[in-house]
């Protein structure tokens, strides 16, 4: 299954997904040091450096899962919390790429401040944007300490499945029934 990694950093999403059988087909990361690390670990995988210039037609293979930890500075309590008025507010660019490549799954990650900034309207925009494109979404808040980190910073996770591919629930039930009946293929 193919993975497109936006706002890649040093490739955490790709590393995790690689361990369960996904193939990263492209990265988008602007920081030079991160791009150097990505290039070293994922030799031959295309690295785009500007989300604003990345177009869906640039991605030649189908995308099964698209991930992205879009910039958190507009929402972080450590920053000025300018929300949509911050130059680093790049959700609209990530959403544009989602619409263009039409992945089956998306996973987005950000700081907890995303939920509250501008009276919750930014978080609502992210969720309603995805739903308007036919995604069933679930949101989670997971503290970093919950997965073994030595701090408890809470992260917001948004997981979506494209309803254009049929109901995820029915696929899970069908798969479970195949396994249960001993007919797993």
Report residues per predicted region.
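Class I S-adenosyl-L-methionine
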Residues: 54-65, 73-185
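A short, Lys/Arg-enriched amphipathic alpha-helix followed by its capping loop at the start of a domain
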Residues: 16-23, 41
